[in-house]
Design a protein with these regions (language model features):
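Aromatic, loop-rich ligand-recognition surfaces of beta-strand-rich domains
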Residues: 43-96, 122-176
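Extracellular carbohydrate recognition and processing domains
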Residues: 97-120
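Disordered, acidic Ser/Thr/Pro-rich linker "stalks" and the adjacent N-terminal cap
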Residues: 1-59, 168-176
Length: 176
């Protein structure tokens, strides 16, 4: 499994290097324990502010296929219900996240919060420009949700840059 790092999913990689960090954001994050804390596997964490709900929006620099999600979190304060949305033109607000139908909904158990890959419906996550997670509640129903680490496992979609093509024959603008 060389070149796959710690993903433990054959043929896929951690997609963190494809994040467009300027386009990533989190709603209802606490000032002291913000969103960036959960993007690295470190002792810090992301924590919700006013209540247990969070909306995390991650954009990618190029289209990706997402196979699975990895979460590390406290067994009491970790997420329980997560709604996943893809390719939204704007970040969801909490009312929309509650009412819109997600691409997939995950109901997590404490054992899902140990950092092992949680498989997604791969066919539904094929051409992903951005993904938004609505964390509806946490394991214990406490006021704050915490996430120590969040990552997506998948692969980049090869894109064609039309500027890289060279004319084969004929003159510019000439048809067959």
């Amino acid at each position: 499994m060389s070149g796959e790092g710690e993903t433990s999913v054959q043929g896929h990689v951690d997609l963190a290097s494809f994040y467009d960090k300027k386009q990533c954001e989190c709603l209802n994050e606490s000032d002291e324990n913000g969103f960036k804390n959960c993007l690295t596997n470190s002792p810090s964490y992301l924590e919700s502010d006013c209540d247990e709900q969070l909306i995390i929006s991650i954009s990618f620099m190029q289209p990706v296929k997402i196979h699975s999600i990895k979460l590390k979190a406290d067994k009491e304060k970790g997420p329980k219900t997560i709604k996943l949305f893809i390719n939204r033109t704007q970040t969801l607000d909490f009312d929309s996240a509650n009412s819109y139908a997600p691409v997939q909904e995950l109901i997590l158990t404490p054992s899902d919060l140990e950092g092992k890959p949680i498989n997604l419906k791969f066919v539904k996550f094929q051409n992903v420009q951005n993904i938004q997670l609505f964390i509806k509640d946490n394991q214990s129903g406490s006021e704050a949700t915490q996430i120590e680490y969040l990552s997506f496992i998948g692969s980049a979609i090869s894109t064609t840059k039309m500027g890289d093509f060279k004319r084969v024959a004929g003159k510019k603008g000439e048809s067959h």
